[in-house]
């Protein structure tokens, strides 16, 4: 009966996520909100509710090599997607190849997978997600872009110091590192502070989904849809193969495996379209690819969550 309740909870929460996404889209279509409002929500999520959700999941950790596995997989998953993007566009010009590297890579863990997992699984599970997203964030914030820039233009345009500055200007990444340090040192944040941060942390799933609904765009032609579907298929088939290796062969505990698998099926990072523009792309493909990946991911995450609690 307990499993049935959990499965029903997963289904209702997934439906709730879709409804909140639709609510954001509906409000935008009725001109009650705008694209700019979505950007405001994105700022709130990245700088307030997501860091608070991370702090609220703080638990003591004993260092072991297995702790590095989710972190390494967060980096490796990105590099694998970079390679797939490069190989599937090897006959395109350099700029298109560079854009293909960056606009289908990265995992939207902080504003999608983590809120989903936060709503469905126990808080103690979230730390594996944080470990994965620490590695993922390093690649999403700058790593993938530098690889794409190398492909498109043959050289990096940024110094090492500017890369480090960019990485540490990310509040979620700094919060991840702070939480990991505290957990490994077995330090705890006073409960009075956690009582305050949990207010914002608990709001993270709702605000993140409302933000996504406000930012998504469904205006895609039939030909564009099939092109995008093909590219997403490459992404999710590759991640499916990696997820199978993680689940059946990687020597770590079951909870860590399950959380990493869920992260591997997260949507494309929201930085994908931003980096495509920075490379010089004028195509809306990166934004459309990002939108479709959200709906594919919520379906896959729901199915996987049901399997994990069955």
Predicted regions and their residues:
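Alpha-helical transmembrane segments of multi-pass small-molecule/ion transporters
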Residues: 1-310
């Amino acid at each position: 009966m307990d499993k049935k309740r959990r499965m029903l909870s997963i289904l209702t929460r997934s439906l709730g996520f879709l409804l909140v996404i639709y609510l954001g889209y509906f409000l935008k279509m009725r001109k009650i909100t705008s694209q700019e409002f979505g950007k405001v929500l994105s700022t709130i999520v990245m700088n307030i509710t997501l860091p608070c959700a991370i702090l609220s999941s703080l638990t003591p950790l004993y260092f072991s090599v297995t702790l590095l596995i989710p972190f390494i997989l967060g980096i490796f998953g990105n590099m694998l997607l970079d390679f797939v993007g490069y190989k599937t566009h090897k006959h395109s010009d350099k700029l298109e190849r560079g854009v293909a590297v960056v606009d289908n890579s990265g995992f939207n863990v902080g504003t999608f997978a983590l809120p989903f997992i936060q709503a469905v699984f126990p808080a103690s599970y979230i730390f594996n997600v944080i470990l994965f997203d620490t590695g993922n964030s390093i690649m999403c914030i700058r790593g993938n872009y530098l690889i794409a820039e190398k492909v498109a233009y043959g050289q990096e345009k940024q110094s090492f110091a500017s890369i480090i500055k960019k990485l540490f200007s990310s509040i979620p990444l700094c919060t991840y590192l702070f939480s990991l340090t505290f957990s490994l040192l077995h330090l705890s944040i006073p409960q009075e502070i956690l009582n305050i941060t949990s207010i914002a942390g608990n709001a993270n799933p709702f605000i993140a989904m409302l933000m996504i609904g406000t930012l998504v765009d469904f205006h895609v032609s039939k030909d564009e849809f099939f092109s995008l579907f093909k590219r997403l298929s490459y992404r999710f088939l590759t991640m499916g193969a990696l997820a199978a290796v993680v689940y059946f062969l990687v020597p770590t505990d079951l909870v860590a495996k399950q959380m990493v698998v869920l992260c591997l099926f997260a949507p494309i990072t929201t930085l994908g379209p931003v980096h495509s523009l920075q490379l010089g792309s004028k195509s809306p493909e990166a934004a459309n690819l990002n939108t479709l990946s959200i709906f594919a991911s919520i379906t896959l995450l729901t199915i996987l969550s049901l399997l994990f609690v069955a």
